[in-house]
From Swiss-Prot:
GO terms for cellular component: ribonucleoprotein complex; ribosome. One of its GO terms (biological process) is translation. Binds to the 23S rRNA. InterPro entries: Ribosomal_bL9, Ribosomal_bL9/RNase_H1_N, Ribosomal_bL9_bac/chp, Ribosomal_bL9_C, Ribosomal_bL9_C_sf, Ribosomal_bL9_N, Ribosomal_bL9_N_sf. This is Large ribosomal subunit protein bL9. NCBIfam families: L9 (TIGR00158). Belongs to the bacterial ribosomal protein bL9 family. GO terms for molecular function: rRNA binding; structural constituent of ribosome. The keyword Zinc does not apply. Coiled coil: none annotated.
């Protein structure tokens, strides 16, 4: 019996694939558990339209991410932090601080998408990676300055 998988199963395949399984396995386990659907003409057409919609949605998200990446690339962000005379910060500049400074500039980025190799603990200029989508990333230039 041909079924369409709704979830990834290591022994059968990935979600959305059409696989051939034994009738008993499909009728007694996969279909009642909601893991698979019978592969009829209607479900195959529905699957195809769903894939097209998903592809369109992903492309729209990719375009939006590229626009944000262009904005991020052009920014030279200033982050103010309390620091001692030696240039060492009292505390650290984290991805949350950077996300907040970005939102003040009008660019909304989730703090989890900002990748710091380690928290910033001294004054100076830094480059930080921002992964906005699967294959869209940008480099943000940050200058950490002392609060006056």
């Amino acid at each position: 019996m041909k079924v369409i998988l709704r979830k990834d199963i290591s022994t059968l395949g990935d979600a959305g694939e059409v696989v051939d399984v034994k009738n008993g396995y499909a009728n007694n386990y996969l279909i009642p558990q909601g893991i698979a659907l019978r592969a009829t003409e209607g479900t195959l057409k529905a699957l195809e339209t769903e894939r097209k919609q998903q592809a369109r949605k992903i492309e729209q998200q990719r375009i939006a991410a590229r626009e944000v990446a262009d904005k991020v690339q052009q920014l030279n962000l200033k982050v103010l932090a309390k620091a001692g005379e030696s240039g060492k910060l009292f505390g650290t500049v984290t991805s949350g601080d950077i996300a907040e400074a970005l939102s003040n500039e009008g660019v909304s980025v989730d703090r989890r998408k900002i990748s710091l190799e380690s928290p910033i603990k001294t004054l100076g200029a830094y480059e930080v990676g921002v992964k906005l989508f699967m294959d869209v990333s940008a480099t943000l230039k940050i200058t950490v300055e002392a609060e006056s």
